[in-house]
């Protein structure tokens, strides 16, 4: 596990051939074994039998890329949170009970969860907008497992899943997007309306753990205002989790760091190829609209934009405390400044890694930071200062 958490996932690598607004994508295939009820209705002996059957297939077959199986009962809560921050397990897996585990490939582009929402959930993660490559990787594992396990399948409905929203293909494709131009030009809702007609849902991202009240602590000194005090969330809320069904999403106006999730709504009545086709078309349109919005923003509000970028870079390069939400917003302006040619010397791969490593569990595991909110905020600020050392504003 130490080797896993110290290795940077391949899906974080910057893609020179992919538009910057499209950061990463994943494809999930949910499957259930015909002999058992859904995991939440299983007793522990049944969950254990499902896990044993899956692990025996791993041992006796070579259809999976190199990796390891991790039993949840062998991991502490901090390690589980670290995996959730890496998008290798979902929030449902983090909160589930009973025997369960996850197989993770060494490059962390593939994870197979056992006994989360469904008996098996195959998760493939790719950089940029490689949605078809993500599906192809997941589909190869699905085909191999389907030959060895009797998956629940209905001739008319397709694959049967714990959630009705997954019945059919059992496939969810989601893409992480960075859309500051559309946000600042107030064009996001027009985009959302068009996407909903294509049966695609655009949502904001949520910082934190829904089980914990995320009221930030404002440690402002008397006489300070206008953003001169850090806003630091509780320690367990300094994270970004993902879930299977979109329950960890926010309204567009409430998102953090100009980040958004695009996901297919339909799993019934469309084939996998049709879902991928619609998603790819939408991503091309989104990238074009975002680039147009950035050009328009620079043309119409250039001085204001450059002032905001300068303020963000000054804060990110000097602050001694950074909350998670604040850090994501600063990272958005850093990314925007670099892609629009307003700063030099930035390593975009380092910025991508920072978005992973600045989360609470990663700071504790990788840097030994104490699990107190201010300690995490202090270390996060140090990471940003280190990132920006050697950079310059044009």
Which residue stretches match the model-derived regions?
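Long, Pro/Ser/Thr-rich low-complexity/intrinsically disordered regulatory tracts in eukaryotic proteins
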Residues: 1-156, 163-164, 171, 183-185, ...
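Short glycine-/aliphatic-rich beta-strand segments at the starts of folded cytosolic domains
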Residues: 173-179
């Amino acid at each position: 596990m130490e080797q896993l958490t110290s290795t940077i996932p391949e899906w974080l690598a910057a893609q020179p051939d992919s538009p910057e607004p499209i950061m990463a994508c994943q494809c999930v295939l949910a499957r259930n074994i015909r002999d058992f009820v859904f995991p939440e209705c299983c007793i522990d002996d049944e969950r254990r039998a499902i896990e044993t059957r899956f692990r025996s297939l791993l041992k006796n077959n070579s259809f999976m890329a190199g990796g390891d199986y991790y039993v949840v009962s062998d991991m502490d809560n901090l390690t589980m949170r670290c995996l959730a921050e890496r998008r290798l397990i979902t929030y449902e897996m983090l909160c589930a009970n009973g025997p369960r585990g996850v197989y993770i490939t060494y490059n962390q582009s593939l994870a197979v969860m056992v006994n989360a929402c469904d008996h098996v959930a195959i998760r493939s993660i790719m950089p940029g907008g490689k949605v078809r490559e993500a599906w192809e990787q997941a589909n190869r594992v699905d085909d191999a497992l389907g030959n060895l396990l009797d998956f629940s399948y209905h001739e008319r409905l397709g694959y049967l899943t714990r959630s009705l929203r997954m019945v059919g293909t059992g496939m969810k494709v989601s893409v992480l997007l960075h859309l500051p131009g559309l946000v600042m030009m107030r064009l996001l809702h027009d985009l959302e309306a068009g996407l909903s007609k294509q049966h695609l849902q655009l949502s904001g991202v949520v910082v934190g753990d829904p089980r914990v009240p995320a009221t930030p602590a404002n440690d402002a000194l008397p006489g300070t205002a206008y953003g001169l005090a850090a806003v630091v969330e509780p320690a367990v809320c300094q994270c970004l989790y993902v879930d299977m069904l979109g329950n960890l999403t926010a309204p567009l106006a409430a998102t953090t760091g100009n980040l958004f999730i695009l996901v297919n709504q339909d799993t019934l009545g469309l084939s996998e190829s049709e879902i991928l086709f619609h998603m790819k078309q939408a991503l091309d349109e989104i990238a074009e609209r975002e680039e147009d919005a950035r050009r328009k923003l620079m043309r119409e509000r250039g001085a204001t934009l450059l002032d905001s970028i300068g303020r963000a870079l000054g804060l990110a390069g000097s602050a001694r405390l950074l909350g998670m939400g604040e850090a994501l917003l600063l990272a958005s302006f850093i990314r925007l400044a670099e892609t629009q040619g307003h700063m030099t010397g930035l390593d975009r791969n380092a910025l991508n890694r920072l978005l992973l490593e600045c989360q609470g569990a990663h700071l504790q595991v990788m840097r030994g930071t104490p699990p107190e909110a201010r300690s995490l905020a202090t270390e996060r600020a140090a990471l940003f200062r280190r990132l920006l050392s050697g950079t310059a504003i044009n």
